[in-house]
A protein has these predicted regions:
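Select transmembrane alpha-helical segments in multipass membrane proteins
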Residues: 1, 86-99, 183-201, 237-240
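Hydrophobic transmembrane alpha-helices that form the core helical bundles
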Residues: 1-19, 202-219
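Selective recognition of specific alpha-helical transmembrane segments in multi-pass small-molecule
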Residues: 2-6, 54-66, 101-108, 131-160, ...
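Hydrophobic alpha-helical segments and their helix-loop junctions in multi-pass secondary transporters
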Residues: 12, 16, 20, 56-83, ...
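Membrane-interface loop-to-helix entry segments
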Residues: 24-29, 33-69
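Hydrophobic, small-residue-rich membrane helices and short re-entrant helix-turn-helix hairpins
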Residues: 39-49, 110-146, 162-178, 214-229
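TM-loop-TM module centered on a large, flexible mid-protein loop between adjacent transmembrane helices
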Residues: 147, 151-206, 223, 246-247
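Loop-to-transmembrane helix boundary motifs in multi-pass membrane proteins
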Residues: 203, 219-249
Length: 249
């Protein structure tokens, strides 16, 4: 499911930048990860390392430009009363709805185990650093998660104020397109930057999703059938399921 969600976001980026219909975009975004994942963790690790500087730069720069060019945006999102324009007063039902989403996302911290499994063995000399790495990369990841949620709220508010319909304002492509319009005066450059950032982000996410999914399917079926046809089979199997979910909308 996570693979399908993230691949769909990347497909919408291809539609935005290259006018590729989502039906074909789903197929492209599903199969493009297969060569990387079948080469194993070493290829995935290299991809993550090589793309990290670009990803961090493209993540932060739009927020800096928004802060410089529209300082009132941060105040505006705090005082935004929602679609019903109830003002900035506390509303228990709205708080409950937001809390439900937040609590559900906390369970995704378990996905960090996919990265922590590659931690080097704990030794007497690395005990302190080992525990620090586990805490920061595991449950401590919720801190970055909160920052990302707050940043997403700001971008969604910016999208709404730029007349993006509410049902489309949840699309990261629309969020970052509005933000990158603060960076680039030319709309075409903003579209290109948005598409590049979203594609890099979703590739970084989905190589992990595909790898973790293949491990899960492999473990499940090896215990059920007592056979192991190879992890590549389960990479393709996992990808086909995600593709089917996307095509079924």
């Amino acid at each position: 499911i996570f693979f399908a969600l993230e691949a769909a976001v990347m497909a919408y980026a291809l539609e935005l930048a290259l006018d590729i219909p989502p039906t074909w975009g789903y197929l492209i975004c599903a199969i493009v990860v297969i060569p990387l994942v079948t080469h194993g963790v070493s290829a995935i690790s290299r991809l993550q390392v090589w793309t990290q500087p670009l990803w961090l730069l493209m993540l932060v720069v739009p927020f800096v430009y928004v802060l410089v060019r529209d300082p009132g945006a941060f105040s505006g999102v705090v005082h935004y009363g929602g679609e019903l324009a109830r003002g900035a007063t506390f509303q228990l039902p709205l708080f409950g709805a937001a809390l439900t989403v937040g609590i559900a996302l906390i369970t995704q911290m378990g996905e960090q185990a996919d990265y922590l499994r590659f931690m080097p063995a704990r030794t007497a000399t690395t005990r302190g650093r080992w525990w620090l790495g586990v805490l920061v990369g595991g449950p401590g990841w919720v801190v970055l998660g909160v920052l990302k949620m707050l940043g997403g709220a700001l971008l969604a508010w910016l999208a709404l104020t730029h007349m993006v319909p509410a049902e489309r304002a949840v699309d990261p492509n629309q969020m970052y397109l509005v933000a990158y319009e603060y960076v680039f005066p030319h709309y075409g450059w903003a579209v290109a930057a948005t598409a590049l950032f979203v594609v890099v982000s979703q590739m970084k996410i989905n190589v992990t999703n595909a790898y973790a999914g293949s491990l899960a399917w492999s473990n499940f079926f090896s215990r059920l059938t007592h056979s192991h046809p190879g992890r590549v089979v389960w990479v393709v199997f996992n990808t086909l399921i995600a593709f089917m979910l996307m095509e079924m909308n």
